Amino acid sequence: MLRFPILLTNDDGINSPGLQHLASSLHSLGHPIAILAPLTEQSAVGMKLTLRDDMAFEEHTDIAEKIRTDESAPLRVFSLDGSPCDCVIVAIDGGLRSWAPEIRPWLCISGINRGPNLSIDVLHSGTVSAAREASLYLSLIHI
């Protein structure tokens, strides 16, 4: 049974084991999954946006095949050479419509984070910032 589609991101990068375990677990429950995560580690960047530079985009079919658990639910894995907030904005503001039209996310999950996000440090966290950015977009899409 297919469930609601989920966008996953993080600040630890596309090769993060936590991100891949989370994707595999949610996919095994039948959720269509789209991952758009930073190409490289982006911890403690807060809500940084890339405004004046081009960002490289890449699909990772090798990672998708490694974490795929349900053949009936779509799973697409992408990286962006940008911040976690860049990833969320690009994904929700048209990127996924172009690259993965079969996945229209209803929810964005950011994590699993490699380290702790505690106390005032959450203000610097790329993981928390990506979730905050997603809340600005997803709440408008599904009203």
Q: In which residue ranges do the predicted regions lie?
A:
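Conserved acidic residues
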Residues: 106-107
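A short, conserved beta-strand element in the Rossmann-like catalytic core
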Residues: 13-14, 117
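DG-centered beta-turn motif at the end of beta-strands
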Residues: 10-12, 112
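A cross-family phosphate/adenosyl-ligand binding-site feature
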Residues: 2, 6-9, 16-102, 135
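Glycine/threonine-rich flexible loop motifs
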Residues: 116-125
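Conserved small/polar residues in nucleotide/adenosyl-binding loops
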Residues: 141-143
